[in-house]
Amino acid sequence: MSIRRAGTLIAIRELHGIAEFEQVSELFDGIWHFDPDSRPITVELMRAMSHAGNYVAGAYDDAGRLVGASVGFFGAANTLHSHITGAASGHGVGFELKLHQRRWALERGIDRITWTYDPLVRRNAHFNLAKLGARPEEYLPSFYGVMTDAINQGSDSDRVLASWSLSAPHVAALVRGEPCRRPLPADAAVVLADEDGRPVTRDSDASTLLVALPEDIEALRVADPGAAKAWRLAVREVLGGLLVEGGVVTAFHDKAFYVVERPSLGTASSSDRV
């Protein structure tokens, strides 16, 4: 599969050889600067996963340089779990990799892809929810324990599990390039706000709630670790709490707020479901 992005021809294909997996490992190291003793994926594991029929793919520019890669494995029924995806910024490679992954899954009768991401990173939330149409299903506190890579170093590794329903109408529309924006209800209320860079929680009985994120959590971790930790705990409490109660994240508004719909009266919370 080949596409043209920002004037560059990008070819995406499945990978099978050791030399290709070594290129992927180098690409990922260049993005995350992993501790050599705690890499999330190794050359040997990519080889085994590819041989077993899982998803290992790379994106190459017209000069033959690897500019993106993605690794996923079969999980629950009819589900592919995307373990790691990394790409050079600025060329839309990450989006094209996800579309390739979607086509690959649908060809195999898979209708759902899941992955985890840091719920505090605005650009990731916008990409996952607004561009792809995925929806957060579960809040996972300190999912990977304390991480040591250059981006996450020293931070609690809270994640949300994103679920991508590949054949959902809103996903199909986004894939076709059609925006799916719904206006906020007039009574939508902010329950986590950003006030001078600090998180402030608010009470509300509204059915549509907005959960703010910091402008740049990665920069904040370096400039003000205390504020970064305060945001982590606040989002864990507010967004995580709403998901546990059965709230549904329906959008990411204005590149800054999760939009959460409260469950209607009589709807069981996640802890009550069989």
Task: Show where each model-derived region lies.
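Conserved catalytic-core motifs of GNAT/GCN5-like acyltransferases
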Residues: 116, 126, 133-152, 251-253
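A conserved beta-turn-beta hairpin within the catalytic core of GNAT-like acetyltransferases
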Residues: 74-82, 206-210
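Conserved GNAT acetyl-CoA-binding A-motif
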Residues: 105-120
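A short helix-loop-beta-strand connector motif used in the catalytic cores of GNAT acetyltransferases and
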Residues: 47-58, 155-157, 243-248, 255-258
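Conserved beta-strand in the GNAT
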Residues: 56-58, 64-73, 81-83
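Short amphipathic alpha-helix that is part of the acyltransferase structural core
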Residues: 1-45, 50-51, 58-60
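A short, internal acetyl-CoA/4′-phosphopantetheine-binding micro-motif in the GNAT/acyltransferase core
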Residues: 83-92
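Conserved acetyl-CoA pyrophosphate-binding loop and the N-cap/start of the following alpha-helix
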Residues: 92-100
